[in-house]
Amino acid sequence: MTDSTLYFVKAFFLGIIEGLTEFIPVSSTGHLILFGDWINFESGSGKVFEVVIQLGAILAVMWIFRARLWQLIRGTLSGQRQEMLFTRNLLLAFFPAAIIGAIFIKAIKQTFYHPGVVAVTLVLGGLIMLWVERRAPRSDGSASETATEERATAHSLEEISWKQALGVGVAQCLAMIPGTSRSGATIIGGMVAGIQRKTATEFSFFLAMPTMLGAAVYDMYRNIDLLTSHDLGAIAVGFVAAFLSALLVVRAVLRFVANHTYRGFAWYRIALGVVVAAWLAF
């Protein structure tokens, strides 16, 4: 296998990793950093590769929710109150990360984008998820709900308040640190704010659209001169792989959260963080 072919195989592999992990609370960026380091993936485009292949994953979400997305756009433009309120909530949740990201993202990438940080944030994020999911279980012993769920005031996207949406947006800012997980921060942040788990997951999917599109376009704009034709080919391969794998994951996640908690993902994060820390130590 030639070096060029191996380069594209690695890009395809990382695209699969991106699609599988973007919409579950385990940190896709953290996994890309860890697996990219493991397989010695060196892209001349740097972190642009990681951001742009996320477009493949987000387009998968847009495809799955295309009917609801079109309804939202059409309703907002025609002045329908329910759709306008939902659009307002998405914008409120989007702007905190957009503002902080535009100002600090370069410093964040230079400071935090390495496996040691990922190990720490994986463990901390897992512990926080366990805390949220384990807050005083229901008296009937239900395995799929907790007191956090019982206290939820928003059980549908239309019931989310502007304060809850803003709280999700603030939580999303934490996801700029690799290993935190954008989906994990927004879903858990939503649950703490009083949004029911499945609804928080759906809102996280919709919020991913402007957030990830904006991040990808911004990174491309800032680094377009650094991209070579070789890098663009690798990005295209990773993009397609992320799109196809994300198509499978999004539907599976929606089915999963209807009947399960996120505890399994929390324990996975903790275990992976410990393994990475041990690997770095020895």
Swiss-Prot record:
Has the keyword Hydrolase been applied to this entry? yes
Query: Any transmembrane segments, and where?
Result: 6-26, 45-65, 85-105, 112-132, 200-220, 230-250, 262-282
InterPro entries with a match to the protein in the record: UppP
Q: What is its main location?
A: membrane
Keywords for the protein's UniProt record, in alphabetical order: Antibiotic resistance, Cell inner membrane, Cell membrane, Cell shape, Cell wall biogenesis/degradation, Hydrolase, Membrane, Peptidoglycan synthesis, Transmembrane, Transmembrane helix
A GO term for molecular function: undecaprenyl-diphosphatase activity
Where is it localised?
Cell inner membrane
Report the enzyme's class at the first EC level.
hydrolase
Catalytically driven reaction(s)? di-trans,octa-cis-undecaprenyl diphosphate + H2O = di-trans,octa-cis-undecaprenyl phosphate + phosphate + H(+)
Q: How does it sit in the membrane?
A: Multi-pass membrane protein
Provide an example Pfam family for this protein.
BacA
Name any GO cellular component annotation. Answer: plasma membrane
Example GO biological process: response to antibiotic
Q: Which family does it belong to?
A: Belongs to the UppP family.
What extra comment accompanies this record? Bacitracin is thought to be involved in the inhibition of peptidoglycan synthesis by sequestering undecaprenyl diphosphate, thereby reducing the pool of lipid carrier available.
Q: What is this protein called?
A: Undecaprenyl-diphosphatase
The species this protein was found in: Bordetella avium (strain 197N)
